Amino acid sequence: VPVLARWIEAAGIPTVTVTMMPSVAEERLAPRIVGVEFPFGHAFGMPHDRVMQRRSLELALRVLAGATKFSTRVDLDVEWPVPLREAYRRWQPKEPSPIVKKLLESRKSRP
């Protein structure tokens, strides 16, 4: 995503990256970064939680409008309401996808 953000920025369009991996976004030189400690797939918050989603969006817009230097990073001060380990477990499907299943099988067959 940071590479895409820089490409869009080169066209004159400002961007902000909302990410669960802000340190990686910094390493990849994303122009503006909002770090969130949320499970993957939920960058703006819990499904149907409009208050949490709005806080994430408002911070992203403030960073977009107010960042004065390249690679500005601001972390959202909101905790996921469920322990992250439990949230990740819930997020994972009960059965692995065909490609993950094949990968796991190939690992088992290695000496």
Annotated model-derived regions:
Residues 32-37:
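Short, hinge-like loop/turn segments at secondary-structure boundaries
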Residues 40:
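Catalytic-face loop-and-helix region of soluble metabolic enzyme cores
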Residues 30, 47-51, 88:
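Surface-exposed beta-strand edges and their flanking turn/coil or helix-capping segments
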Residues 1-28:
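Short, acidic/small-residue loops that bind anionic groups at enzyme active sites
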Residues 1, 6, 30, 55-63, ...:
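Hydrophobic transmembrane alpha-helix bundles
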Residues 43-72:
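A charged, well-structured terminal subsegment
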Residues 62-111:
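Extended, histidine- and acidic-residue-enriched regions that form the cofactor-binding/catalytic faces
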